[in-house]
Amino acid sequence: MRKKLFGQLQRIGKALMLPVAILPAAGLLLAIGTAMQGEALQHYLPFIQNGGVQTVAKLMTGAGGIIFDNLPMIFALGVAIGLAGGDGVAAIAAFVGYIIMNKTMGDFLQVTPKNIGDPASGYASILGIPTLQTGVFGGIIIGALAAWCYNKFYNINLPSYLGFFAGKRFVPIMMATTSFILAFPMALIWPTIQSGLNAFSTGLLDSNTGVAVFLFGFIKRLLIPFGLHHIFHAPFWFEFGSWKNAAGEIIHGDQRIFIEQIREGAHLTAGKFMQGEFPVMMFGLPAAALAIYHTAKPENKKVVAGLMGSAALTSFLTGITEPLEFSFLFVAPLLFFIHAVLDGLSFLTLYLLDLHLGYTFSGGFIDYFLLGILPNKTQWWLVIPVGLVYAVIYYFVFRFLIVKLKYKTPGREDKQSQAATASATELPYAVLEAMGGKANIKHLDACITRLRVEVNDKSKVDVPGLKDLGASGVLEVGNNMQAIFGPKSDQIKHEMQQIMNGQVVENPTTMEDDKDETVVVAEDKSATSELSHIVHAPLTGEVTPLSEVPDQVFSEKMMGDGIAIKPSQGEVRAPFNGKVQMIFPTKHAIGLVSDSGLELLIHIGLDTVKLNGEGFTLHVEEGQEVKQGDLLINFDLDYIRKHAKSDITPIIVTQGNITNLDFKQGEHGNISFGDQLFEAK
C-alpha cells in the first residue's frame, strides 16, 4: 500500500512540473518588461524611455502577467495531460470541467460582479465568470478528475447508434457531468478549507517565521531524492500567505505574491520560501563539485572534470541540482544530510538579512539576474557574500568528509566501471534493456532531471548498467525506480515510449507494455516484403477489422497491420509452419516466425495480461518448431469474457516493411481453423 501510494505521489509530482515549466517564459517577459519600465534601468539606458520601447515593455509585462493570472486553469490543463500520459483530450476535458465547475459554483452561491469586489468574500472573476476562488488547488483537483475520466473512459464501447460518442469523445462528456456534480460540494466545503489554509499559513509565519523557512528548505531538500518535493512546495508557492494588490484582489502563495509585487513595482514582502536556493545552487554545490574533483584519483580526474564541470554549470545557471546531488547521495548520505541542513540555514540567513528574492523556475543565475538584479527591489548583492561563505563551507566540509570517511564519490571507486558506449540514438534502447525490457515496465514517466519507472520486478533492473549509461544515481523505492539522467531524461522517456509503442523498431528486441497490454515482436530486417506469406486462421470465430478493436494501439495499427478474430472456441493453433519466437510470461500472447520469415503476434483478448496466466494452458515453448495446425494454447473463453476487457484477439504482422495484406475471405464473417486468413506481401 505504501509503495503504491509513493508511486501515485511521484506521478502527481511529475504532473505538476508541466504547468511549472511554463513559468520561466512568463517570468522572462514579466521581468524584462517591468525592468524596462523602472527608473533604475532607465537611468543607465535612457533610450528605453522612448514611447515605442515603453509600449513594448507594457505588452511584455501584460503577456507574462496573464500566465500568472490564470495559473489555476494552466494547472488544470497541465495536471490532466501529465496524469493521462500526454493525451490532449484530457486537457480539453479539463478545460470543460474547469469552466463548468466555476460557472456552477458561481450561480449556486449567487456570486455577482458586485460582490467579487469584497476581498473577504473569497470570490473572484475567473475567465470572466464570477465564482468562488479555489486557486491552484481547484485547478489541480479538476486536472486530476479529468485524467481519471480519460483513463477510465478513453476506450469505452457504446451501442452502434451511439458509436460517434464512443472512445475519447466520451471523455469530455463524462467530465462535464462529473465537474457539474463536483461544483456543489466544492461550493459548500471549499470556503472552510480556504479559511483553514489561511489560518495555518498565517500562524506558521506569525509564530516563528525563521523556524518555518529553515524547516521548509531542509525538508524540501530531503524530499528531492524521492521526487516528492514538487508536492511539498506547491502549497507554499501557490496558496499559503495572502497579499492585496492595487486592484483589491487577494493574491495567495509566496511565488504568486512575489511575481505580482514585481509586476506592480510594489514593496517586496514575498520570497521567503524561494530565496534560500540561490547561495546553495550558485555557490555551494559548484564548490562541492570542485571538492569531488580534487579528491578523485589522478587517473580519473579528466573524466570527473567533465562530469562535475557540467553538473556545476547546470546548477549555477539553471538551479537544476539533481545530476550533482545524485553523484554523492548514495555513496555519501551523510553529505546529503549536511547539504539539506545547509540549505535550510540558507533560507534562514537570507530571511534574517531581510532579503526578498524569488524565481519562476529555480535558484540559478538566470532567475537571479531576471528577478533580482534587474528589478533592483531588494538587496540582491547580499547573496554574493553569503554565497562565497557557502562555497568555502561546502568545499572544505565535502573535501574533509570524503577523505576522512573514504567515500567512493565519482573518481574514487576501487575499480572504475566500464562506461557504456551507447550513442545518443542507442541510449533509449540500452536504458530500456537495463530496466528489464518492455515486459518489466508497468509505468514510464520523466520529469526535468529523472527517468521515473514503475517496474514489475525490480530484480530484473540492471542498476550498475544504468549508471554506466550515464545515470548519476538510481533511487529504488519498492518497485519505483528513478534514474537521474539530468535534463535529457524526458527525451529518453519519449524515445523509450516510441520503442515500446512499436513506432520505432531498430535494435531487435521483444517487449511488453502493460499500459496497453500489448506485445511487440520487433521486425527482423532479414525478412523481405518481396516474398508472399500465407497465414491461416489460428482460431475459429468471427473475423473483425483491426479498426474495430477497442484498443487504439491495435485499431490505429501502431503495432502493425493485421486483423482480429472474436473466438468461439478456446484454442489457438499455428497459422503456418515456423517457430515459436516468444511467449509472454502470462501466456496471453505468443509471437511466431514462419519459415518464410513472416513475424506474427497473436494477442488473446484485451487487458488479459492482468489475468496473470489464469485461464491459459500452453502446449509449446519458446524456440519450438511448429507445423500449421499444431495446438499452441488452450484458453478458458468464459473466464476471459468475465474477467478481461474483451475476448477479441488481434493477429498482427509486426514487420513494418510488410503493409500489403490480402484478406482472402474479407474482413467480416465467420472463419474456422485452417481457413486462409490473409496473404502478406
From Swiss-Prot:
GO terms for cellular component: plasma membrane. The active site is at 447 (phosphocysteine intermediate), 603 (tele-phosphohistidine intermediate). One of its GO terms (molecular function) is D-glucose transmembrane transporter activity. It is found in: Cell membrane. Pfam families: PTS_EIIA_1 (PF00358), PTS_EIIB (PF00367), PTS_EIIC (PF02378). Residues 3-414 form the PTS EIIC type-1 domain. PROSITE patterns: PTS_EIIA_TYPE_1, PTS_EIIA_TYPE_1_HIS, PTS_EIIB_TYPE_1, PTS_EIIB_TYPE_1_CYS, PTS_EIIC_TYPE_1. The chain crosses the membrane at residues 16-36, 73-93, 126-146, 170-190, 199-219, 273-293, 303-323, 328-348, 355-375, 383-403. Its EC number is 2.7.1.199. It is an enzyme of class 2 (transferase). It catalyses: N(pros)-phospho-L-histidyl-[protein] + D-glucose(out) = D-glucose 6-phosphate(in) + L-histidyl-[protein]. The keyword Kinase applies. GO terms for biological process: D-glucose transmembrane transport; phosphoenolpyruvate-dependent sugar phosphotransferase system. The EIIC domain forms the PTS system translocation channel and contains the specific substrate-binding site. This is PTS system glucose-specific EIICBA component. It comes from Staphylococcus aureus (strain bovine RF122 / ET3-1).
